[in-house]
């Protein structure tokens, strides 16, 4: 009798890599690259499902809701990674998008024995951050069957939070525990069962779509520029000056002065140059337009 994972797409052997142990270096990387090409096509097939989850999540965010990713192992690490990039890129509070990994942050570097097999641990973790009905919990599990994720989704459903699930198998168990589910079928891994590869890449690409779309909808992007970037190092300071200069048809020197005068707030600096008003007035304009720079510029008195 086979094991409970035998029929999962993520556990099947890949016929294209069965002899990878005797391949040359060039053959190995060509095989990996060939398999990786399939990922974007797999995601393309589930774009309607991704869209539904994004729109439903954004509706929750309008009422103060947060986005919480939960997962174990690679899936958990990817959630933490995506969440941690939101504050520096879009200037949002670190609590708005959070990643929770089974076993805690120590598990980012070293797996914690038994954490992913617990049906109750995620509930405790979600209680710790005071999960509420305005929030969205998105469970990540390449195999679609991680108990930690299932337990977390069940608790989120219980308190009325929105739930989503991302997996890489058909008819995933976690899909049955979420209102919205995404099953990106990338096929067997080059190394059997190594879901840090194609499945992990697929999950990261989907998370990129989710977080980026949400931030765009929140007005954190002007055209395709990250106007809420936090200028916390030399590279980001230069990027901020360039964004301000480009959006206001100003010189880099004028942009630099406005950035300093605004207290390193890119959107405020942009409005200061466009309206010739002071920092306080421009902050008020932004506040009147929900912090959305596009709306603020359209509604400049």
From Swiss-Prot:
<dbReference type="GO" id="GO:0046348">
    <property type="term" value="P:amino sugar catabolic process"/>
</dbReference>
<dbReference type="GO" id="GO:0009254">
    <property type="term" value="P:peptidoglycan turnover"/>
</dbReference>
<dbReference type="Pfam" id="PF20741">
    <property type="entry name" value="GKRP-like_C"/>
</dbReference>
<feature type="active site" description="Proton donor">
    <location>
        <position position="85"/>
    </location>
</feature>
<feature type="active site">
    <location>
        <position position="116"/>
    </location>
</feature>
<dbReference type="InterPro" id="IPR040190">
    <property type="entry name" value="MURQ/GCKR"/>
</dbReference>
<dbReference type="GO" id="GO:0097367">
    <property type="term" value="F:carbohydrate derivative binding"/>
</dbReference>
<keyword id="KW-0456">Lyase</keyword>
<dbReference type="InterPro" id="IPR001347">
    <property type="entry name" value="SIS_dom"/>
</dbReference>
<dbReference type="GO" id="GO:0097173">
    <property type="term" value="P:N-acetylmuramic acid catabolic process"/>
</dbReference>
<dbReference type="GO" id="GO:0016835">
    <property type="term" value="F:carbon-oxygen lyase activity"/>
</dbReference>
<dbReference type="InterPro" id="IPR005486">
    <property type="entry name" value="Glucokinase_regulatory_CS"/>
</dbReference>
<dbReference type="InterPro" id="IPR046348">
    <property type="entry name" value="SIS_dom_sf"/>
</dbReference>
<comment type="subunit">
    <text>Homodimer.</text>
</comment>
<dbReference type="InterPro" id="IPR005488">
    <property type="entry name" value="Etherase_MurQ"/>
</dbReference>
<protein>
    <recommendedName>
        <fullName>N-acetylmuramic acid 6-phosphate etherase</fullName>
        <ecNumber>4.2.1.126</ecNumber>
    </recommendedName>
</protein>
<comment type="pathway">
    <text>Amino-sugar metabolism; N-acetylmuramate degradation.</text>
</comment>
<comment type="similarity">
    <text>Belongs to the GCKR-like family. MurNAc-6-P etherase subfamily.</text>
</comment>
<dbReference type="Pfam" id="PF22645">
    <property type="entry name" value="GKRP_SIS_N"/>
</dbReference>
<feature type="domain" description="SIS">
    <location>
        <begin position="57"/>
        <end position="220"/>
    </location>
</feature>
<comment type="function">
    <text>Specifically catalyzes the cleavage of the D-lactyl ether substituent of MurNAc 6-phosphate, producing GlcNAc 6-phosphate and D-lactate.</text>
</comment>
<keyword id="KW-0119">Carbohydrate metabolism</keyword>
<dbReference type="GO" id="GO:0016803">
    <property type="term" value="F:ether hydrolase activity"/>
</dbReference>
